[in-house]
């Protein structure tokens, strides 16, 4: 499949997703929620999947209220049968799949020497296996449609430079996502399918302490350690996802882009 760009198109239209169909995993909160809303706002029909059914429904209702199109599907991405069912729901609702965004993850601090094998397996099942299962279900649909497609995985800067705030199971699972991204990009480029990753740095998220609108800025706080002296907001990660998912990035594949305010350089 050859997906070609036009040198005569100087508009911003390639940054939109009008007429495209997308699945976003882990879309019930945080980066996933911001991504689902943003993709819908630029014209995509979005399947909002999340482990928590109420979260998926809430985000879907917000998208519809804003004039977008979405359906909610509960899905544990580490469970093969649930992933298959989610993609079949998408088939029934919108037909050909154009965009897959793998955001679903699991994060819990574990000490290396006391972590159980079960805890290790859970982390890798959600992040590694979940990413693989979704790609395995997306690629045949994108290939067979003749339209190609775009897959964006949400990894982490921890895949490149682990920090004390993370743990070995999370860091290694995210490093695996980067490897999956590059391998899949090489394997599926022949079908017009692009595969990229966004590597968020520290990002405001559900469950973060309520600071009453005040962000700590001292040198020993997370924002204070960042070159930009703040952490990212979910929408800033979602905008990077949108760019990679959109036709504007039509010749970009196999890259893992840090969105961390120069954090990896500090």
Task: Give a label for each model feature.
Residues 156:
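Residue(s) in the substrate-gating loop at a strand-loop-helix junction
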Residues 189, 194, 252-254:
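Short, small/polar-rich loop/turn modules that mediate ligand/substrate recognition or access, typified
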Residues 10-13, 190, 200-226, 231, ...:
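A glycine/serine/threonine-rich, flexible loop-to-helix segment
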Residues 2-13, 161, 241-242, 253-266:
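Short C-terminal tail/terminal secondary-structure segment
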Residues 140, 186-187, 250:
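Alpha-helical segment proximal to the catalytic Tyr-Lys
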Residues 111-112, 116-124, 222:
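Substrate-binding pocket helix/loop in short-chain dehydrogenase/reductase
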Residues 135, 173, 181:
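Active-site helix of classical SDR
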């Amino acid at each position: 499949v050859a997906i070609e760009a036009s040198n005569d198109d100087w508009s911003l239209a390639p940054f939109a997703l009008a007429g495209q169909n997308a699945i976003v995993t882990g879309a019930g909160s945080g980066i996933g929620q911001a991504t689902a809303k943003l993709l819908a706002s630029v014209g995509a029909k979005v399947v909002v999947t999340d482990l928590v059914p109420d979260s998926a429904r809430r985000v879907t209702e917000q998208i519809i209220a804003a004039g977008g199109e979405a359906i909610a599907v509960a899905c544990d991405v580490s469970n093969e049968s649930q992933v298959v069912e989610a993609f079949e729901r998408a088939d029934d609702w919108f037909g050909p799949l154009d965009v897959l965004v793998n955001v679903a993850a699991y994060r819990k601090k574990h000490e290396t020497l006391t972590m159980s094998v079960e805890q290790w397996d859970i982390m890798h099942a959600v992040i590694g296996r979940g990413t693989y299962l979704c790609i395995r279900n997306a690629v045949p649909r994108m290939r067979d449609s003749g339209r190609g497609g775009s897959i964006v995985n949400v990894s982490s800067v921890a895949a490149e430079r682990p920090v004390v705030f993370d743990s070995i199971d999370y860091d290694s699972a995210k490093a695996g996502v980067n490897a999956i991204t590059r391998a899949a990009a090489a394997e599926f480029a022949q079908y017009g399918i692009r595969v990229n990753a966004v590597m968020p740095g520290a990002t405001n998220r559900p469950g973060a302490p309520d600071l009453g609108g005040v962000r700590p800025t001292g040198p020993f706080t997370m924002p204070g350690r960042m070159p930009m002296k703040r952490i990212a907001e979910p929408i800033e990660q979602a905008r990077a996802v949108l760019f990679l998912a959109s036709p504007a990035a039509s010749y970009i594949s196999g890259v893992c882009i840090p969105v961390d305010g120069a954090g990896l350089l500090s």
